[in-house]
Amino acid sequence: MSSIVVVGTQWGDEGKGKITDFLAEQADVIARFSGGNNAGHTIQFGGETYKLHLVPSGIFYKDKLAVIGNGVVVDPVALLKELDGLNERGISTDNLRISNRAQVILPYHLAQDEYEERRRGDNKIGTTKKGIGPAYVDKAQRIGIRMADLLEKETFERRLKENIEYKNACFKGMFNETCPTFDEIFDEYYAAGQRLKDYVTDTAKILDDANVADEKVLFEGAQGVMLDIDHGTYPFVTSSNPVAGNVTVGTGVGPTSVSKVIGVCKSYTSRVGDGPFPTELFDEDGHHIREVGREYGTTTGRPRRVGWFDSVVLRHSRRVSGITDLSINSIDVLTGLDTVKICTAYELDGEKITEYPANLDQLRRCKPIFEELPGWTEDITGCRSLDELPENARNYLERISELCGVHISIFSVGPDREQTNLLEQLW
């Protein structure tokens, strides 16, 4: 099996969906391995724009399988809404497969997410309140309900009653709140499970069959390395592992199955939610990037925080995710700026450091050390090769590659498919 993993190298929203869709043309199977409907990606297909949250990008290709792996947490009601929306626009979803081992998000997870953020007050993490974290907590506590359980009426009824009793005790003690009732959950979610039943299967077997048949598998990451619960800006992170290594756990394939890891980044940096962001901009350059780049969350609609490109972040991501190739998006957004900056290192308490600190208090004290390069004013949205880029834009990309220690295989100068440029064959 030839396989490629696509991961975000920053704090999510790097354009992974677009790159996944671009690479999916040559794949046989496209599989998601982590996260839930807190992730949002925008796809241009057939001249139309689609915003997906749970459904893999491969859904648009009838001859390819789109797989939701066991590492994904699934809100069945939200998933059905997404599938219905695609069907209404003429997109078939018959090629979707959902792992029978995927955890189910239920209304008490959504309630718990809301209560937890309220309890934290000024120390809130800034979650999307989609129930992702609480669902992963239940998984670790071994009380989670999986897709296989949801489909069996007696099993779902028994497990749901047990969990509601437990959640009520927790909610009363911690939040002085009550859990959604059995009657408020059971009928709706059991019916949702029955509607999804034909999609649910052992997806690890599908991927193993693809391996045996020497098919091409594309693993689609969610969020980004800096939101990884182990390797990101903890605790301002997601509740799963977006790093490439989680492909093995989140889909059931072996580690030897991965051929390449494509790290996707923007030509600048963005972040949604709270947490440290060393290169964040609050000036006119930041306003330019946010408005030209349309930096508003796909899932939340919240304005994203934006900043200069941070090579300290990228080097960290390269190391912990084994990135072999770089895909740089949104280069066109920087057009018109007099100068562009790259963070090459941090200053921490008067000393220069080149590695990303694990300690949050240290990270907050870090000051970015910038290298300044001349900008460009030429319209680059029609460029199809590095040689066609203005010299200053080309020098900017080459400097990023040099600082991060990864060669560039893809660059993008706009949102459309034809504005994504492949510099070398990846499959």
From Swiss-Prot:
Pfam families: Adenylsucc_synt
UniProt GO molecular function: adenylosuccinate synthase activity; GTP binding; magnesium ion binding
Pathway: Purine metabolism; AMP biosynthesis via de novo pathway; AMP from IMP: step 1/2
Domain of life: Bacteria
Keyword Iron-sulfur: no
GO terms, biological process: 'de novo' AMP biosynthetic process; IMP metabolic process
Alphabetized SUPFAM superfamilies for the sequence: P-loop containing nucleoside triphosphate hydrolases
GO CC, alphabetical: cytoplasm
Family statement drawn from the similarity comment of this UniProt entry: Belongs to the adenylosuccinate synthetase family.
Binding residues annotated for substrate, in chain numbering: T298, T299, T300, G301, R302, P303, R304
Protein's recorded name: Adenylosuccinate synthetase
Binding-site residues for Mg(2+), renumbered to this chain: D13, G40
The protein's assembly and partners: Homodimer.
Protein purpose: Plays an important role in the de novo pathway of purine nucleotide biosynthesis. Catalyzes the first committed step in the biosynthesis of AMP from IMP.
CDD domains, A to Z: AdSS (cd03108)
Enzyme class: ligase
Cellular location(s): Cytoplasm
Gene: purA
Active site per UniProt: D13 (proton acceptor), H41 (proton donor)
Catalytic activity: IMP + L-aspartate + GTP = N(6)-(1,2-dicarboxyethyl)-AMP + GDP + phosphate + 2 H(+)
Residues given in the record as IMP binding sites: D13, E14, G15, K16, N38, A39, G40, H41, T128, R142, Q223, T238, R302
Species this chain originates from: Staphylococcus epidermidis (strain ATCC 12228 / FDA PCI 1200)
Cofactor(s), by name: Mg(2+)
Transmembrane segments: none
